[in-house]
Every structure is written in structure tokens, then in C-alpha cells.
Amino acid sequence: MINIYFNNNLCKQFHRGIKGYDVVADLFPELKNKAIAVKVNGESYDLSREITENCTFEVITTNSEEGLEIIRHDTAHIMAQAVKEIFPDTQITIGPTIKDGFYYDFATEHNFSSNDLEIIEKKMIEIINKNESFIREVWTREEAIKFFSSIGEDYKVKIISKIPNNENITVYKQGNFIDLCRGPHAPSTKTSKSFKLTKVSGSYWQGNSSNEKLQRIYGTAWRNEEELKSYLNNLIEIEKRDHRKIGKELELFHIQNEACGQVFWHKKGWTIYRTIENYIRKKLETNGYIEVKTPMLLNKELWEKSGHWDKFRENMFLSEAEDKVLAIKPMNCPCHIQIFNSKIRSYRDLPIRMAEFGICHRYEASGALHGLMRVRGFTQDDAHIFCTESQVISEALKFCNLLMEVYKDFGFTNILVKFSDRPENRAGSDETWDRAESALKKSVEAANLNYVLNPGDGAFYGPKLEFVLKDAIGREWQCGTLQMDFVLPERLGAYYVGSDGKKHHPIMLHRAILGTFERFIGILIEHHSGKFPIWLAPTQLSILTISEESIEYANSLKTKAEEHNIRVELDATNEKINYKIRNHIHKKIPVFWIVGKKEVNENSVSIRYLESNTQQVMPIDKALKTLLTCVSI
């Protein structure tokens, strides 16, 4: 007999070798139809797997996140089976679950198309409708290598060769299909009915571009058709909001192969960029920051001293001149320490809040680049606060308040804060980490911000806060950071003279609000679907003429608006007014002033807003005053 513990240490005895579904039926009969797997001593088991020792026991249901992940894992196996049945010469490699779905990488001479996805889906439905059981088997290494070699699955053999000798080799069967897998799986294929294959892309074996090219098929799977439909509708909305599409439509920017991963900002996009930069600059000035500018190209010796050479060398763009190796900076922090070190500092000088709109470059594989969201050349709204340990709480609190103020102005009010504490490999004593973590926690609490713990994810040099924005359609974007560093200042010889007359290393707070301008603008485009807040819109006002006799008056309105620094366009073309309105709606300009004979005679304008179908007549002075209120921030 074995003891099975459940529900906070309740215990019941069962025969050794009992299967998970029998335990569920006995202890949790109400979950019998919802169970998809179980946890035995914290390890996920199939419902059909035997339990042979005393253990803790939990039920994994389809309603849980773990249950949904199993459904997606099942569906990946079903897709691999379908592909093998349709394209027998294909080799299967790996097929993990990912956020919202799964993928599988295939080695094949056939180029998968969208038409193929439909064919594969039909075959998957056939497999699912057969209600094939997922059967787990444990094989020896020799058996596994012999079998997968015999069916030409070379990549599976490579995977097996990397599995430690003391680990079991497990495979799963469904029908005639066998795949290498740790599991767990649902009892049968019937739980995978709500799925959709979404796209095909290229990939490389083990993610290394020097290895063989593969083809990756992505899919999504859900508990039911309602969840699937909701997700697919969300995908349509994401596609509508794609910043690359909107960026082209609104003539904001473009990216081309001759400058891979770098942005060509067009006039309107550059207007948004400069508006954000000027806004942030004013916020920095108000909050006591000094703005600096540091070189882009630095001798590798500085990066060796800072420790970045060992960690970031592969991501640096390098150059040689006069027998010296130079690197384009991937970050700004070592440069800011050079400014701090340029003269002797006193404790009375601290805190020093040093900011830079720093242009940085990092090598990213071309396949990883994605519009503005992932680039090689970018500008950070970077700042470093040099302070004493006693100043950390107040400085971190001030930063949290500033960050929340900025996010609110950009239209983000749903912010998740993640607190990352000490990692296993770290510098500094436990006492130092205790004080550092306590200081960051106190600052977040003082700012009235809730946070979730991200255990062990801090940097080796100190704990950190990450600020995650939730956009208009519920996606999360990590932008802001606050990282505490008690290593780099010491490594680069930064010190101040304390009240005791002795040298002390400052604490360095790395902080950013936007992250990078490029990515943040991409997020803004998608969050607002290109319909920017009036203060941020590249064109804030369109003046539309109804007839030729109102052109002179419209020009005077344009001049008046420009005198108040309003970004304005005049459309005095010989088109019908409804056409003009549609055209400027397509441009997503937030405010229209429509002027005809009546408005000329009354010294007024007819106001229409982008999101409204109605118009309001208003005297020009009042209309201007109303607009100025909207564009100010």
C-alpha cells in the first residue's frame, strides 16, 4: 500500500501501481471529467501513469493554465503526425508550447504554404476524431536511437544523444505515430478540437544561424471554440494595429535592407520622436536631472574594465583604427561613470541624476528584427543616479512617481511592476542584498504600487524593478526599469568623499522610462491604432475649405494656428468636402476645422473630431482656445 496526500495533508491509502485517473475518481469525483493530468510529488503525470510510492497528489484540470499548456502540447504532436502523414519525407525536430500556442520545426525540401496549412488542419481533425490514445513508454537509449535512426529521424537521434545517461528516454504514441517526449499528455486526442494553424516561418536547428535551415509552423489551441474565436479575433485586431502597416500608411518611417535594423524616420514620424524627446527633456529638467552626451565609439579597454566585453562582445559592432579595437556602445552606463569620475565628488554633491538620449547599437540576428520593436540602432531615454545608500529609497520613490506620471500622459494606466530579487550567481554580500532589496521594496510601497515577485531574476550586480505596460488590447510590454548597481561604480573606480573624509563608492541606479524611443513609438502606434493623443499627433489640425472663396480665410487661420505652435495642414484643393474629410480621417488627424462662406462671414469654424460624425460651429477665438487646451501637456 502507498499513502497519497491531498488537500493540505489529508491522506488515503491505495494499492501500489494505482493510476492517476483512479485516484481522481476516488478523491475528486467532481473533477473526473475535467482532469487532464495530475501532479505526483510536484511532477506532472499522465492520468494513465502508475503511482508507485508515497506522494502528494494534485489534479490538473483543463481550466488551469497547466491544463491549457497540455492541450497545446497535445496539438503540437497531432500537427507533427499530420505533417508526417502528408509529407512522409519530412523530419520532425522540436515542438514546444509557447505563449498562446505552440510550434513545430520541420526539416523538409517542401516549402510550406498557407494552402498546406489548410490541408494539415484537415488531417489533424481526422486524427482528433479518431480519439487516439496518447500512450507513454519508457525506452532504453539503445532502443530509442535504433528506432529513430531506422525511420530517418536524425534530429531525434541528436536530441537523444544530449540526454544525460541517467535519465529515462520516454516516447509517446498516438496511433502509428511515435515522438520523443517527456510528457505529460491528455488521455487522448479528443481534447485538442479547438485549434488553428496560424503561420509558417523559417528557423534554424537549435536557433543557430550556422546550422541547418528548418521550417516552423505555428499554431494556437484553446479549451473550446469560444476561446479560440476570441483569440483569432484578437489576432485580426493585432494585424490592424501593426505599427509597420500604420507607419507606412501615415508616412512615419521605413526600414530597408541597406540599413538592416535601423530606422529611416520620415517627417511625421520624426515629429513624434522630437515631441517625445522634448516632453521627456522637460520632465528631466523639472526633476533635477542633468543632460549629457557621450561618445558612440569607445576603446575596448573600457568595456573590458566594465565587464561588458565578456558578456556583450558578440552583440557589439566593432571597428579597428590605429591598431586599436573600438566598439560602438551597446549601452551608456560606463560612459556616465567617466563623467562622474572627471572630478572629485563630495557626499554633498549627491545625488547626481545624469541623463542622456543615448544612441546605442547592438547586433541582433536579422531573423529576430521586427519593425521598431526590435532594431540594431536605437536611442535610450537612459539615466543613472549616483547616490549614497541612504538616498536610495527617496530616489527610487521619485523615479517611480515620475514614471507613472509619464505613462499616464501617454495613455497607459494599467501598469504591472515586477520585483526581481537576488540571483544565484551574484556579487556582494547577503547583507548588502538585504539592504538593497528592502530599499527598493519600500520605495515601491511608498509610491502605492503593487508588485509581483520575480524570484532570482535580478542582475548579478543588484535587484531591479521592471515596469510592464498593458496596452489597449491587453498585451503586455516591458518598458521601464530601475536597477540597483553596487558593482560597476567600484569596478570603474567611481568614488565620492564622505562626511568622514574617506572614499566611498556610490550606489548607481540605472533607470529608463520608455526603454528605447523606437520600440516605445511602435508600442504607441499599436496602442492608439495610429490615432495619437492631440498633443502627440504629427499633424494636430486640418483646415478644410468648402469653396474657393474661403481659401484666404483658411490661410489666415493656418497662420494663427502656427503662431501658437499648432501643427497644422491646410487642404484647399478643389475636391468635395466629404472627400477631404474622408482623406484626413484616413490620415488620422485628430481635429478638423471646416470653413466655407458661412464661417467666413461669421469669423467662425465648424469643428469635427476624428472619432465623431458631428460638427460644432464655434467662434475662431474660442475654437483656438479649446484646441490649445487639448494640445498642451
Swiss-Prot record:
<dbReference type="InterPro" id="IPR033728">
    <property type="entry name" value="ThrRS_core"/>
</dbReference>
<keyword id="KW-0963">Cytoplasm</keyword>
<dbReference type="InterPro" id="IPR012676">
    <property type="entry name" value="TGS-like"/>
</dbReference>
<dbReference type="InterPro" id="IPR047246">
    <property type="entry name" value="ThrRS_anticodon"/>
</dbReference>
<keyword id="KW-0479">Metal-binding</keyword>
<keyword id="KW-0067">ATP-binding</keyword>
<comment type="function">
    <text>Catalyzes the attachment of threonine to tRNA(Thr) in a two-step reaction: L-threonine is first activated by ATP to form Thr-AMP and then transferred to the acceptor end of tRNA(Thr). Also edits incorrectly charged L-seryl-tRNA(Thr).</text>
</comment>
<dbReference type="GO" id="GO:0004829">
    <property type="term" value="F:threonine-tRNA ligase activity"/>
</dbReference>
<dbReference type="InterPro" id="IPR036621">
    <property type="entry name" value="Anticodon-bd_dom_sf"/>
</dbReference>
<dbReference type="Pfam" id="PF03129">
    <property type="entry name" value="HGTP_anticodon"/>
</dbReference>
<keyword id="KW-0436">Ligase</keyword>
<keyword id="KW-0648">Protein biosynthesis</keyword>
<dbReference type="InterPro" id="IPR045864">
    <property type="entry name" value="aa-tRNA-synth_II/BPL/LPL"/>
</dbReference>
<dbReference type="GO" id="GO:0005737">
    <property type="term" value="C:cytoplasm"/>
</dbReference>
<feature type="domain" description="TGS">
    <location>
        <begin position="1"/>
        <end position="61"/>
    </location>
</feature>
<dbReference type="InterPro" id="IPR004154">
    <property type="entry name" value="Anticodon-bd"/>
</dbReference>
<keyword id="KW-0862">Zinc</keyword>
<dbReference type="InterPro" id="IPR002314">
    <property type="entry name" value="aa-tRNA-synt_IIb"/>
</dbReference>
<dbReference type="InterPro" id="IPR004095">
    <property type="entry name" value="TGS"/>
</dbReference>
<dbReference type="GO" id="GO:0046872">
    <property type="term" value="F:metal ion binding"/>
</dbReference>
<protein>
    <recommendedName>
        <fullName>Threonine--tRNA ligase</fullName>
        <ecNumber>6.1.1.3</ecNumber>
    </recommendedName>
</protein>
<feature type="binding site">
    <location>
        <position position="510"/>
    </location>
    <ligand>
        <name>Zn(2+)</name>
    </ligand>
</feature>
<dbReference type="Pfam" id="PF00587">
    <property type="entry name" value="tRNA-synt_2b"/>
</dbReference>
<dbReference type="GO" id="GO:0005524">
    <property type="term" value="F:ATP binding"/>
</dbReference>
<keyword id="KW-0030">Aminoacyl-tRNA synthetase</keyword>
<dbReference type="GO" id="GO:0000049">
    <property type="term" value="F:tRNA binding"/>
</dbReference>
<comment type="subunit">
    <text>Homodimer.</text>
</comment>
<feature type="binding site">
    <location>
        <position position="384"/>
    </location>
    <ligand>
        <name>Zn(2+)</name>
    </ligand>
</feature>
<feature type="region of interest" description="Catalytic">
    <location>
        <begin position="242"/>
        <end position="533"/>
    </location>
</feature>
<dbReference type="InterPro" id="IPR018163">
    <property type="entry name" value="Thr/Ala-tRNA-synth_IIc_edit"/>
</dbReference>
<feature type="binding site">
    <location>
        <position position="333"/>
    </location>
    <ligand>
        <name>Zn(2+)</name>
    </ligand>
</feature>
<keyword id="KW-0547">Nucleotide-binding</keyword>
<dbReference type="Pfam" id="PF07973">
    <property type="entry name" value="tRNA_SAD"/>
</dbReference>
<dbReference type="InterPro" id="IPR002320">
    <property type="entry name" value="Thr-tRNA-ligase_IIa"/>
</dbReference>
<keyword id="KW-0820">tRNA-binding</keyword>
<comment type="similarity">
    <text>Belongs to the class-II aminoacyl-tRNA synthetase family.</text>
</comment>
<dbReference type="InterPro" id="IPR012947">
    <property type="entry name" value="tRNA_SAD"/>
</dbReference>
<keyword id="KW-0694">RNA-binding</keyword>
<dbReference type="Pfam" id="PF02824">
    <property type="entry name" value="TGS"/>
</dbReference>
<dbReference type="InterPro" id="IPR006195">
    <property type="entry name" value="aa-tRNA-synth_II"/>
</dbReference>
<dbReference type="InterPro" id="IPR012675">
    <property type="entry name" value="Beta-grasp_dom_sf"/>
</dbReference>
<dbReference type="GO" id="GO:0006435">
    <property type="term" value="P:threonyl-tRNA aminoacylation"/>
</dbReference>
